[in-house]
Amino acid sequence: WIMGHMVNAIYQIDEFVNLGANSIETDVSFDDNANPEYTYHGIPCDCGRSCLKWENYNDFLKGLRSATTPGNSKYQSKLILVVFDLKTGSLYDNQASEAGKKLAKNLLKHYWNNGNNGGRAYIVLSIPDLNHYPLIKGFTDTLKQEGHPELLEKVGYDFSGNDAIGDVAKAYKKAGVSGHVWQSDGITNCLLRGLSRVKDAVANRDSGKGYINKVYYWTVDKRATTRDALDAGVDGVMTNYPDVIADVMNEAAYKSKVRLATYEDSPWVTFKK
């Protein structure tokens, strides 16, 4: 999965997919009442990027739906996975469940079209704080209450705070999650970060006993870092330059080992070599 980083304006969906991304990451900011409000990152953000692009969240969802609904004039068949980077740092811990409920209602209405031929992309809810694990139950309970438990097949989870792997496992246990887990590791492109935790996450994934199904590394903009990440065995790389990742994947050393994921590749099933 080549994951386009910080895709917060509707026009950027096409821009990143056309550069080679089959997945995008979108920031979601919340208002004081835990309503998802804007797709907005703000300052500071990655070096070399504008931090200030934004849409109203519901408008972005409608644009995303158009891009991921077969038959729509805006349809992009390659776009199969969307990571919502939930900026819950602005919320009190006791608002996490409420944020999950409201997120579920927004997605159901504006993205899934109330279960009636909505967008087809898989969704990952990425949460920066382990203490906000109740967001997951708020989300899953709401989809069930609204009569659409089947849509949970399309939803996965990520804790993005670079916490110890054991602590993340405990948070999932509390949230009642087993499966559909992506584990992120990374840092802004302005700084360097080693791959030791990525390797731990890959080992957990491949042990057959761990909680992790997929591992992604962020933010990867250079060819050398891309090669290191692919060598470490990641499933996804998040990038500001999807074309760089696509180029590396076409190099002789990687061409026979990795390929771009398609809609038929489940993002929840650990790839067996």
Curated annotation (Swiss-Prot):
Question: For this protein, what does the record note about how its cofactor is bound?
Answer: Binds 1 Mg(2+) ion per subunit.
Q: Entry's SUPFAM superfamilies?
A: PLC-like phosphodiesterases
- The reply on keyword Magnesium is yes
The record's listing under CDD domains reads: GDPD_like_SMaseD_PLD
List the GO cellular component terms: extracellular region
| Binding positions for Mg(2+) per the UniProt entry | 25, 27, 85
Q: Where is the active site?
A: 5, 41 (nucleophile)
Query: Which molecular-function annotations from GO does this UniProt entry contain?
Result: lyase activity; metal ion binding; phosphoric diester hydrolase activity; toxin activity
- What cofactor requirement does the entry state? Mg(2+)
Question: What tissue specificity is annotated for this entry?
Answer: Expressed by the venom gland.
Q: GO BP, one example?
A: killing of cells of another organism
| Reactions catalysed, as given in the entry | an N-(acyl)-sphingosylphosphocholine = an N-(acyl)-sphingosyl-1,3-cyclic phosphate + choline; an N-(acyl)-sphingosylphosphoethanolamine = an N-(acyl)-sphingosyl-1,3-cyclic phosphate + ethanolamine; a 1-acyl-sn-glycero-3-phosphocholine = a 1-acyl-sn-glycero-2,3-cyclic phosphate + choline; a 1-acyl-sn-glycero-3-phosphoethanolamine = a 1-acyl-sn-glycero-2,3-cyclic phosphate + ethanolamine
Cite the entry's keywords alphabetically.
Answer: Cytolysis, Dermonecrotic toxin, Disulfide bond, Hemolysis, Lipid degradation, Lipid metabolism, Lyase, Magnesium, Metal-binding, Secreted, Toxin
Q: Where in the cell is it found?
A: Secreted
EC number from the UniProt entry: 4.6.1.-
Cysteines joined through disulfide linkages: 45-51, 47-190
> What family, per the record?
Belongs to the arthropod phospholipase D family. Class II subfamily.
Q: What does this protein do?
A: Dermonecrotic toxins cleave the phosphodiester linkage between the phosphate and headgroup of certain phospholipids (sphingolipid and lysolipid substrates), forming an alcohol (often choline) and a cyclic phosphate. This toxin acts on sphingomyelin (SM). It may also act on ceramide phosphoethanolamine (CPE), lysophosphatidylcholine (LPC) and lysophosphatidylethanolamine (LPE), but not on lysophosphatidylserine (LPS), and lysophosphatidylglycerol (LPG). It acts by transphosphatidylation, releasing exclusively cyclic phosphate products as second products.
- Designated name of the protein: Dermonecrotic toxin LhSicTox-alphaIA2biii
Which organism's genome codes for this protein? Loxosceles hirsuta (Recluse spider)
For this protein's source organism, the top of the classification is: Eukaryota, Metazoa, Ecdysozoa, Arthropoda, Chelicerata
